[in-house]
């Protein structure tokens, strides 16, 4: 697996299927995103995970924001799953201020040769988190890429998310937390 870390300028060779997200505590929703891009390999697209480092949770949440999965653990999981490229894009004042349209055009399309994008229904990106699924769907038509929005997954009426996993860990419910993080 190729890892592109801490670079704001790069160019991927070939065309890409990209999954975008925080990927903290890789759970069922993340696995659905990853499965979508891995399926695109049969169409000749390389599988790419795009995430920010540090994550938006840590960057905007301050030092108290705790992640479930370390950078190294995420890398190991993605490698095991057969991901071709991992992009750990630096999140800093300059990149956080990127216009959402510019983010899609310059980073996802131009730098990553994206032809397919998988994202969660609550995806947000760009300045002020203004980029969302509606913008992606509009831009897909205009810019020759396909977007697949993955709906939320629920367990016992509760949305499966990194926050849910974190809550269960804090309650001491390690069995459920482990189940939520397993494939």
Task: Tell where the protein language model's regions lie, with residue ranges.
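Nucleotidyltransferase catalytic core that binds NTPs
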Residues: 1-183
């Amino acid at each position: 697996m190729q890892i592109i870390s801490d670079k704001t300028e790069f160019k991927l060779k070939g065309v890409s299927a990209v999954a975008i997200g925080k990927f903290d505590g890789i759970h069922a929703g993340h696995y659905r995103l990853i499965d979508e891009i891995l399926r695109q390999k049969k169409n000749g697209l390389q599988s790419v995970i795009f995430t920010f480092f540090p994550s938006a949770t840590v960057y905007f949440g301050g030092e108290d924001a705790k992640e479930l999965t370390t950078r190294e653990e995420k890398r190991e999981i993605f490698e095991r799953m057969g991901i071709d490229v991992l992009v750990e894009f630096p999140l800093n004042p300059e990149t956080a201020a990127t216009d959402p349209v510019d983010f899609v055009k310059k980073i996802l399309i131009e730098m990553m040769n994206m032809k397919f994008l998988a994202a969660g229904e609550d995806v947000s990106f760009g300045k002020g988190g203004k980029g969302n699924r509606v913008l992606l769907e509009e831009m897909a038509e205009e810019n020759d890429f396909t977007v697949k929005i993955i709906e939320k997954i629920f367990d016992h009426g509760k949305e499966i998310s990194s926050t849910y996993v974190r809550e269960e860990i804090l309650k001491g419910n390690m069995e459920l937390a482990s189940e939520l993080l397993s494939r």
